[in-house]
């Protein structure tokens, strides 16, 4: 699968860039107002009681700021944050080493927490509930279990697939917050903030053009801004205009709704070869040369979200909205 300009997943070279533009406080964090206001209250209450904040689960689509929020939680609490991920914790001993190194009140951030294996998860239960872990020392008949007390800490888990979390793990989170897609106004503000950090001048209309194509996702917005800035810089533009932004985005093959060439290929393929559907997933896969899992998990969600595609018992169907976007007539069936 090729790397896409409009993918919400973090790309290899983006970690350092994202670190440099990441907000560090709730005041700097744009959007997610309900989540933000609730977290402010929970954090303030925990500080007033001099207790560790309840464990927090942040879930929702990729690229919406779950890692950033976890950093802000630690900053607002005035504690250190230890970062890891579900796939990185392979054995119970790995988790035990992380937990025993925590200081009182610290935040442990586990990204992709749905990918923890079951044995590791079982070590996490008493750690979350009672701030202790049981470890086995020795082997065979001489093996014995030793209980280690842990300092009070806050686990912040992040996942794009909350449904894959086991019930025992999910039930141990005192705070659960779903992050939603951003609107154009919020994304415009984010783009303007990032442009200021990059020392890049751009017109308000240019920010709006980039925001419209960002699929409601800050990560995509910031990526598109960086690429538009490249085009402007090489062209000698001191200030990014709306026309420069539009021209650059067209060269990147990102249309006014954030659809790229793969989206066009998929939708137009169903329109022209199958009269708009219904058509089966396997057939689409053969037509565009992509795996069925990739189509279902990567390409289709946004097309479903904007109402361009429907899943029916008989297969995929392109909607009249999609025909309108591509200036094509809806076929008579």
From Swiss-Prot:
DNA binds at residues 311, 316. ATP binds at residues 21-22, 63, 66-68, 129-131, 172, 182, 219. It is found in: Cytoplasm. Keywords: ATP-binding, Cytoplasm, DNA damage, DNA recombination, DNA repair, DNA-binding, Hydrolase, Nucleotide-binding. One of its GO terms (cellular component) is Holliday junction resolvase complex. Its EC number is 3.6.4.-. Gene3D superfamilies: 1.10.8.60, P-loop containing nucleotide triphosphate hydrolases (3.40.50.300), Winged helix-like DNA-binding domain superfamily/Winged helix DNA-binding domain (1.10.10.10). The keyword Nucleotide-binding applies. GO terms for molecular function: ATP binding; ATP hydrolysis activity; four-way junction DNA binding; four-way junction helicase activity. Its main location: cytoplasm. Residues 1-182 are annotated as: Large ATPase domain (RuvB-L). It catalyses: ATP + H2O = ADP + phosphate + H(+). Homohexamer. Forms an RuvA(8)-RuvB(12)-Holliday junction (HJ) complex. HJ DNA is sandwiched between 2 RuvA tetramers; dsDNA enters through RuvA and exits via RuvB. An RuvB hexamer assembles on each DNA strand where it exits the tetramer. Each RuvB hexamer is contacted by two RuvA subunits (via domain III) on 2 adjacent RuvB subunits; this complex drives branch migration. In the full resolvosome a probable DNA-RuvA(4)-RuvB(12)-RuvC(2) complex forms which resolves the HJ. Belongs to the RuvB family. The RuvA-RuvB-RuvC complex processes Holliday junction (HJ) DNA during genetic recombination and DNA repair, while the RuvA-RuvB complex plays an important role in the rescue of blocked DNA replication forks via replication fork reversal (RFR). RuvA specifically binds to HJ cruciform DNA, conferring on it an open structure. The RuvB hexamer acts as an ATP-dependent pump, pulling dsDNA into and through the RuvAB complex. RuvB forms 2 homohexamers on either side of HJ DNA bound by 1 or 2 RuvA tetramers; 4 subunits per hexamer contact DNA at a time. Has 3 domains, the large (RuvB-L) and small ATPase (RuvB-S) domains and the C-terminal head (RuvB-H) domain. The head domain binds DNA, while the ATPase domains jointly bind ATP, ADP or are empty depending on the state of the subunit in the translocation cycle. During a single DNA translocation step the structure of each domain remains the same, but their relative positions change. This is Holliday junction branch migration complex subunit RuvB.
């Amino acid at each position: 699968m090729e790397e896409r300009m409009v993918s919400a997943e973090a790309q290899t070279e983006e970690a350092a860039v994202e670190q440099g533009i990441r907000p560090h406080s709730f005041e700097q964090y744009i959007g997610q107002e309900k989540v933000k206001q609730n977290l402010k209250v929970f954090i303030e209450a925990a500080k007033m009681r001099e207790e560790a904040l309840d464990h927090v689960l942040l879930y929702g689509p990729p690229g919406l700021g779950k890692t950033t929020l976890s950093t802000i939680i630690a900053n607002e609490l005035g504690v250190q944050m230890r970062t890891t991920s579900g796939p990185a914790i392979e054995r119970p001993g790995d988790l035990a080493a992380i937990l025993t190194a925590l200081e009182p009140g610290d935040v442990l951030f586990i990204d992709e927490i749905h990918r923890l294996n079951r044995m590791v998860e079982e070590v996490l239960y008493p750690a979350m509930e009672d701030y202790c872990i049981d470890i086995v020392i020795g082997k065979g008949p001489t093996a014995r279990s030793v209980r280690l007390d842990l300092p009070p800490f806050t686990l912040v888990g992040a996942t794009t697939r909350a449904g894959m979390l086991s019930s025992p793990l999910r039930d141990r989170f005192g705070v659960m917050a779903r992050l939603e897609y951003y609107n154009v106004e919020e994304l415009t503000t984010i783009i303007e903030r990032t442009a200021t950090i990059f020392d890049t001048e751009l017109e308000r209309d240019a920010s709006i053009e980039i925001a419209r194509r960002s699929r409601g996702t800050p990560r995509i917005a910031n990526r598109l801004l960086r690429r538009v800035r490249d085009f402007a810089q090489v062209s000698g533009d001191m200030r990014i205009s709306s026309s420069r932004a539009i021209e650059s985005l067209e060269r990147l093959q990102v249309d006014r709704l954030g659809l790229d060439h793969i989206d066009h290929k998929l939708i137009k393929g169903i329109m022209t070869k199958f009269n708009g559907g219904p058509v089966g997933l396997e057939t689409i896969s053969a037509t565009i040369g992509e795996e069925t899992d990739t189509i279902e998990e990567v390409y289709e969600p946004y097309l479903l979200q904007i109402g361009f595609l429907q899943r029916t018992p008989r297969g995929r169907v392109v909607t009249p909205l999609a025909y309108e976007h591509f200036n094509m007539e809806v076929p008579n069936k």
